[in-house]
């Protein structure tokens, strides 16, 4: 079965079985909602078990979650450092124009048929996502995911077409 990272358990939260998660999910509210099915993977990336979310809330930069049948700190402390993943079957459907991060990462980025580089990661600093584009012989390019910049995303062909606004690429 194929799984995709959605977060890392960084610590416990209180004594009632809550965990502090650093999310890397494209849809955190959906991914960590009550009833969601996730999988726990240990620090060696080995599958441990399936878990069900029974509560979720945001606190600062973290998602605070609780699993079904794990209601005390003693039951969850061993999971610190573990990774939460969603199975491909539990990902859910997307609206047109929406993408999963794993679909975008690795895509080739072009401006007017000139290869700029490849998307290596996606940041969520605020109002919009920022795609980090790895370029050959240059510093990484921070590409805001906004309509005037990202013109098209072709998932089947792993291609993104962009128009770089003035000042966006300080190495040109």
UniProtKB/Swiss-Prot annotation:
Compartment(s): Cytoplasm
Family per record: Belongs to the RimM family.
SUPFAM superfamilies: PRC-barrel domain, Translation proteins
Entry keyword set: Chaperone, Cytoplasm, Ribosome biogenesis, rRNA processing
Organism: Streptococcus pyogenes serotype M5 (strain Manfredo)
Protein name listed in UniProt: Ribosome maturation factor RimM
Keyword Cell wall biogenesis/degradation carried by entry: no
PANTHER family, per the entry: RIBOSOME MATURATION FACTOR RIMM
Domain-related comment: The PRC barrel domain binds ribosomal protein uS19.
Pfam families: PRC, RimM
NCBIfam families linked: 16S_RimM
Top-rank taxon: Bacteria
């Amino acid at each position: 079965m194929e799984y995709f990272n959605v977060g890392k358990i960084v610590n416990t939260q209180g004594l009632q079985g809550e965990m502090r998660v650093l999310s890397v999910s494209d849809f955190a509210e959906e991914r960590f909602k009550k009833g969601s099915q996730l999988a726990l993977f240990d620090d060696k990336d080995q599958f441990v078990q399936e878990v069900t979310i029974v509560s979720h809330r945001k606190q600062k930069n973290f998602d605070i979650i609780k699993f079904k049948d794990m209601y005390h700190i003693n039951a969850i402390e061993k999971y610190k450092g573990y990774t939460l993943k969603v199975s491909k079957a539990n990902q859910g459907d997307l609206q047109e124009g929406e993408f999963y991060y794993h679909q975008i990462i690795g895509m080739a980025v072009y401006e007017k048929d000139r290869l700029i580089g490849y998307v290596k990661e996606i940041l969520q600093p605020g109002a919009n996502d920022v795609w980090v584009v790895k370029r050959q012989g240059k510093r990484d390019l921070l590409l805001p995911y906004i309509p005037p910049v990202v013109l098209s995303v072709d998932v089947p062909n792993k291609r993104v077409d962009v128009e770089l606004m003035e000042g966006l690429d300080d190495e040109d």
